[in-house]
Amino acid sequence: MNIQALLSEKVRQAMIAAGAPADCEPQVRQSAKVQFGDYQANGMMAVAKKLGMAPRQLAEQVLTHLDLNGIASKVEIAGPGFINIFLDPAFLAEHVQQALASDRLGVSTPEKQTIVVDYSAPNVAKEMHVGHLRSTIIGDAAVRTLEFLGHKVIRANHVGDWGTQFGMLIAWLEKQQQENAGEMELADLEGFYRDAKKHYDEDEEFAERARNYVVKLQSGDEYFREMWHKLVDITMTQNQITYDRLNVTLTRDDVMGESLYNPMLPGIVADLKAKGLAVESEGATVVFLDEFKNKEGEPMGVIIQKKDGGYLYTTTDIACAKYRYETLHADRVLYYIDSRQHQHLMQAWAIVRKAGYVPESVPLEHHMFGMMLGKDGKPFKTRAGGTVKLADLLDEALERARRLVAEKNPDMPADELEKLANAVGIGAVKYADLSKNRTTDYIFDWDNMLAFEGNTAPYMQYAYTRVLSVFRKAEINEEQLAAAPVIIREDREAQLAARLLQFEETLTVVAREGTPHVMCAYLYDLAGLFSGFYEHCPILSAENEEVRNSRLKLAQLTAKTLKLGLDTLGIETVERM
C-alpha cells in the first residue's frame, strides 16, 4: 500500500473543494521529525500565493473539507500553513495485518510497462575491471526493483563487441597458431591484446593484415565471423562467472552488443540525409545541433559517418535507441552509464528525437553515476597504479570477510563459514556502492564497508538475523501467529509500523529515480527503529500473550521487509551470523 499516494489524493480533493485549481500539488511528504506527525502536506504556500490568500487561511479551509476518518488520528496546522498528519494506530494495525497476509507485503502493482535497462557493458577480449562495478550492480538493483513491481524488464548488456581491434586480435591469434580460441582463458586474451597492439603499432605488414581482416570480418566472411564469435564466447563465459559471483541477474541471453546494430547504420545515415538533418562537411556526414554550441558559439557538429565511411559510437547509439523503441517496444529506456558520457548521449538522443525515431512520450533516461575513488581521492587503482580487475577485488573481499567471520565464529563448520563469508564479502562491496547516491563519486574503504556498525551490508545482514533470532527463542511458527491480531498502543510500535508501511513508497522512488541508496537508507532506518522497539517494547516477556503475539507480528513484518528490500538490491541474507 502507498500511504503517501492515498493521502496526496485526499488532500488534493480537499484543496480543490477549498478553491484550489484542479492541477494543484498537495506536496505530501514523510515527516522528518516525529513531532510533525507521520506525513506533512506542504503545498499550501504555493497554491495560496496563486489564490492571493494567506497559506494558513487556505490550510484551515482545506481542513474543513479533509476527511481522513479511519486513516488519521490527528490532523493539525503548523507554522505558516503546513498540515501535519498523524496516522491512526488502528489503521496501522490493519495494514500491518494485510501486509503479512500478502506475498508482496501489501505492495500494489502499477500499470505494467516494458522497460529496457542498459547496464554493465564490458568489452570483448578484456577482463572486467572495477570501472564496470557501478553500472553492473546499480543497474541490476533497478532491474530487480522494476521486476518486483510487475514491469516487463528487458536487460540490455551493450557489450563492446565490434571494431578494428578484432582484426588485430584475429591476426595475432593466427600468427601464434592459437586459432582454437575456445580453449583459452580471458587472462590469455588480455596478454594477446597487449601483444597484438604492440605488433600493430610496430609492424606495418602485420597492421595491414589486421586491417584486411577487419574488412573481411565486416563483409561477413565465415572464417573471420567464426573467430570473432570465439572471442565473444570466451569473454562472456568469463564475465558470467563474475556476474554469478556478484549475484547479478544478467545472463548470456541479455547480450545486445554493438554488432547487433551494424546492419541499421547505412540506412540511418541515408535517412538522416533524406530528412535534411545530416549534411556533408569536409568529407564526413554531420548533424548540426542548435542545442549544443562549439567554442565559437555555433551549432555543434556531430559526426555520424567518417570520411573513410566508418561509423561512430553516436551512430550506433542512434540505432540502439531506435531499435529499443521499434523492435523491443520500450515504454521507457534507462541507461546506466557513467557521467562522462552524458553529453555524448544527449547529442545522440537529440538526433533520435529530431528524426522521429523515438517519440517524446517514451523517456530516454541517463541514470549516470560518479567514480569509485581510493582513499587518496583519486581513481581506484592497484598499488602499482594499474587497473583493478573485478575478479581480484571480489577475491580480496571474500578473503577479508572469511577472516572476519572466522574470528567471530571460531567453531563454525568450514562449508557454513564459506557461505557466510561469501554473503558478507560480496554484500559488503555491493552495499558500499549502492548505499551512496549514484550521482556522486565515493571512497572505496575496506574497513568501513566490512564494519558491523553503520549503514553497511554486515550490519544489515546482522540486523536481519537478530530479528529471526526472536522467533527461534519464541518457538512459534508463522501459521500459529497468523490468526493473532495486531494491536498498536505504544509510540515505538506505531513508529515501526508506519515505517514498515512505507516500503512501497521507497520502492516507487527507486523505480522512478533509479536510486538504490534510497532503499539502503530506508532499510537502515527500519533496522534502527526495530532496535529501539526491541529495547523498549518487550516481546517474549510482554505482559500478556496478546501483546506478545502482536509484537512478534511486527518483528515478523520487519524480517520480511528487510529480506525483500535487500533482495531488490541483490544483497544476500543469511539465517545466522
Swiss-Prot record:
For this protein, what reaction is catalysed? Answer: tRNA(Arg) + L-arginine + ATP = L-arginyl-tRNA(Arg) + AMP + diphosphate
Motif position, 'HIGH' region: 122-132
The main enzyme category here is: ligase
GO CC terms of this entry? cytoplasm
Keywords of the record, alphabetical order, are: Aminoacyl-tRNA synthetase, ATP-binding, Cytoplasm, Ligase, Nucleotide-binding, Protein biosynthesis
Q: Which domain of life is it from?
A: Bacteria
Checking InterPro entries in the record gives: aa-tRNA-synth_I_CS (IPR001412), Arg-tRNA-ligase (IPR001278), Arg-tRNA-synth_N (IPR005148), Arg-tRNA-synth_N_sf (IPR036695), ArgRS_core (IPR035684), DALR_anticod-bd (IPR008909), Rossmann-like_a/b/a_fold (IPR014729), tRNAsynth_Ia_anticodon-bd (IPR009080)
SUPFAM superfamilies assigned to the protein according to its UniProt record, in alphabetical order: Anticodon-binding domain of a subclass of class I aminoacyl-tRNA synthetases, Arginyl-tRNA synthetase (ArgRS), N-terminal 'additional' domain, Nucleotidylyl transferase
EC number(s) given by UniProt? 6.1.1.19
Tell me the compartments it is located in. Cytoplasm
* Pfam families hit by this protein: Arg_tRNA_synt_N, DALR_1, tRNA-synt_1d
Q: Which molecular function terms from Gene Ontology are attached?
A: arginine-tRNA ligase activity; ATP binding
**Signal peptide interval:** none
Q: Quote the subunit structure annotation.
A: Monomer.
Recorded protein name is Arginine--tRNA ligase
Species annotation: Shigella boydii serotype 4 (strain Sb227)
Q: Please name the gene that encodes this protein.
A: argS
